[in-house]
Amino acid sequence: MTNTRKSHPLIKIVNHSFIDLPAPSNISAWWNFGSLLGVCLGLQILTGLFLAMHYTADTTTAFSSVTHICRDVNYGWLIRYMHANGASMFFIFLYFHIGRGIYYGSYTFMDTWNIGILLLFAVMATAFMGYVLPWGQMSFWGATVITNLLSAIPYIGPTLVEWIWGGFSVDKATLTRFFAFHFILPFIITAMVMIHLLFLHETGSNNPSGMNSDSDKIPFHPYYTIKDILGVLFMMITLMSLVMFTPDLLGDPDNYTPANPLNTPPHIKPEWYFLFAYAILRSIPNKLGGVLALVFSILILMLFPILHSSKQRSMSFRPLSQCLMWMLVANLLILTWIGGQPVEHPFITIGQLASVIYFFTILILMPSTALMENKLLKW
């Protein structure tokens, strides 16, 4: 008699995905982030569901309902801060996951990579709409500024913005639809994650060497299930430390002031995980140009498989490319810092310089360095 785990139509899928899955024997902790993102998504859906039970999507009561959750609901403060800081953890892991993909050349799995970029866009949209829901000052003005960017689209722009707003400004209709979208998107993301995994399991995982590992595979369970559980443990320690000791560390104090359309905050800025893109947006003094730069700063990820010019897949044995990779990371950190600074000298110049370096490194420096490394192989 065959084992139920291997014969049952439903359990069989789980078995082939998480138990009897052949995995490379040498994948490092950088491969932990996929499972951590899965845990994050589950955590966000769970905490979000409980928050939605007490939240009201109405301009007059939204802010009060969040206050009510924190003050009157049993462990409401815990659920709220786990949800808010869980989003931060989600983005940290996302950026690590993408960075790992770039460093080890995982983007050569085109299907997996492209659905991953669509996932990134979906998560960014969800996070943006979630930030609007507490209806604080930064929620309101963030929504106003970011949705207003769409008015830069030629011909249909202004009409499109009013259509998204559901009126002539960010108001009750906007908040209601943002709540609806914020609720539904995580489930769409879950479906996309399944497609992401489906494509990944077609090819099997990449590994640090970037070489074919078919000759040396080990079962996913128990080796990587244990490794993933350890990763989850570290994640929960970090998340709960944030939630319990400094829950507002990554938030904006302005969001503790109820939304007021008549009073603009001195510095409008998004959550920390969008600051790098916000800095790129602000570094171009033209509205449409800025919007295009903003979109392309993420879309540029789709070019990585095309721009790959090295004979080796991974950067493990390419010191020059490694230098550029870490330069890119440092540059993104500089952009993140600039995005949170006021628009004045010297921050404007630093932001413009960092934006140029960002695109220049990815589009020109990295491919040309890879070609040079190919030449060096012949020495």
From Swiss-Prot:
Residues that coordinate or bind a ubiquinone: H201
Co-factor(s): heme b
Entry keywords, A to Z: Electron transport, Heme, Iron, Membrane, Metal-binding, Mitochondrion, Mitochondrion inner membrane, Respiratory chain, Transmembrane, Transmembrane helix, Transport, Ubiquinone
CDD domains recorded: cytochrome_b_C (cd00290), Cytochrome_b_N (cd00284)
Binding site for heme b b566: H97, H196
Keyword Isomerase assigned: no
Pfam families assigned to the protein according to its UniProt record, in alphabetical order: Cytochrom_B_C, Cytochrome_B
Listed GO MF terms: metal ion binding; ubiquinol-cytochrome-c reductase activity
Cellular component terms per the entry's GO annotation: mitochondrial inner membrane; respiratory chain complex III
Transmembrane segments annotated in the record for this chain: 33-53, 77-98, 113-133, 178-198, 226-246, 288-308, 320-340, 347-367
Domain of life: Eukaryota
Record GO biological process: mitochondrial electron transport, ubiquinol to cytochrome c
Protein topology in the membrane: Multi-pass membrane protein
Residues at which heme b b562 binds: H83, H182
Family note: Belongs to the cytochrome b family.
Function: Component of the ubiquinol-cytochrome c reductase complex (complex III or cytochrome b-c1 complex) that is part of the mitochondrial respiratory chain. The b-c1 complex mediates electron transfer from ubiquinol to cytochrome c. Contributes to the generation of a proton gradient across the mitochondrial membrane that is then used for ATP synthesis.
Assembly information from the UniProt record: The cytochrome bc1 complex contains 11 subunits: 3 respiratory subunits (MT-CYB, CYC1 and UQCRFS1), 2 core proteins (UQCRC1 and UQCRC2) and 6 low-molecular weight proteins (UQCRH/QCR6, UQCRB/QCR7, UQCRQ/QCR8, UQCR10/QCR9, UQCR11/QCR10 and a cleavage product of UQCRFS1). This cytochrome bc1 complex then forms a dimer.
Note: Heme 1 (or BL or b562) is low-potential and absorbs at about 562 nm, and heme 2 (or BH or b566) is high-potential and absorbs at about 566 nm.
Protein name: Cytochrome b
Species name: Ctenomys tucumanus
Species lineage: Eukaryota, Metazoa, Chordata, Craniata, Vertebrata
Gene: MT-CYB
